[in-house]
C-alpha cells in the first residue's frame, strides 16, 4: 500500500485511542457524581480502546518499514582482539570503600573514627 495510507491509519488509531481515553475519563467522572463506586467501563469503550490500540500498532509497524539486516562480521573484521575486549565502562580508578581497607597506622584520619570504636576493620 501507499506509505501515506499507513500514516493516516496510524493517525486515525491515535485519534480513536484519545477519544476512548476521554470517554473513560468522562465515565469515571459521571460514576463519581452519581456515587457509583465500582461500576465497570461500558463494553463499547473497552472495545474502542482495544481496536484503536490494534489499529495504531498496525499503522506504526507498517510506517516504520522493513528492518535492516545487521551483519556482525562486517563490523568486527577490522577490530583487533584488544579493541574487541576493551570496555571502558568497567575501568575503576577510585574505589568507594578505600578507607575500610587502609592500615591502622596510616596518617589519614577518618571523620567516622570519633563515633566508631577504636578497633580497625580487618578483612
From Swiss-Prot:
One of its GO terms (biological process) is monoatomic cation transport. Residues 1, 62-123 are cytoplasmic. The chain crosses the membrane at residues 2-22, 41-61. GO terms for cellular component: early endosome; early endosome membrane; Golgi apparatus; Golgi membrane; plasma membrane. One of its GO terms (molecular function) is cobalt ion transmembrane transporter activity. Residues 107-117 have a biased composition (Low complexity). The keyword Plastid does not apply. Pfam families: MMgT. Induction: Up-regulated by low extracellular Mg(2+). Residues 102-123 are annotated as: Disordered. High expression levels in brain and kidney with lower levels in heart, colon and liver. Very low levels in intestine. In kidney, highest levels in distal convoluted tubule. Belongs to the membrane magnesium transporter (TC 1.A.67) family. Mediates Mg(2+) transport. This is Membrane magnesium transporter 2. It comes from Mus musculus. The lineage of its organism: Eukaryota, Metazoa, Chordata, Craniata, Vertebrata. The gene is Mmgt2.
Amino acid at each position: 500500500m501507499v506509505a501515506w495510507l499507513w500514516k493516516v491509519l496510524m493517525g486515525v488509531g491515535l485519534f480513536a485511542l484519545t477519544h476512548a481515553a476521554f470517554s473513560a475519563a468522562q465515565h469515571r467522572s459521571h460514576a463519581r457524581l452519581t456515587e457509583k463506586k465500582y461500576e465497570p467501563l461500558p463494553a463499547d469503550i473497552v472495545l474502542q480502546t482495544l481496536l484503536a490500540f490494534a489499529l495504531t500498532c498496525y499503522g506504526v509497524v507498517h510506517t516504520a518499514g522493513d528492518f535492516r539486516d545487521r551483519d556482525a562480521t562486517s563490523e568486527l573484521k577490522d577490530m583487533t582482539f584488544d579493541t574487541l575486549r576493551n570496555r571502558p565502562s568497567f575501568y575503576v580508578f577510585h574505589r568507594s570503600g578505600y578507607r575500610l581497607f587502609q592500615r591502622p597506622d596510616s596518617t589519614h584520619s577518618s571523620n567516622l573514627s570519633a563515633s566508631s570504636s577504636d578497633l580497625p576493620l580487618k578483612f
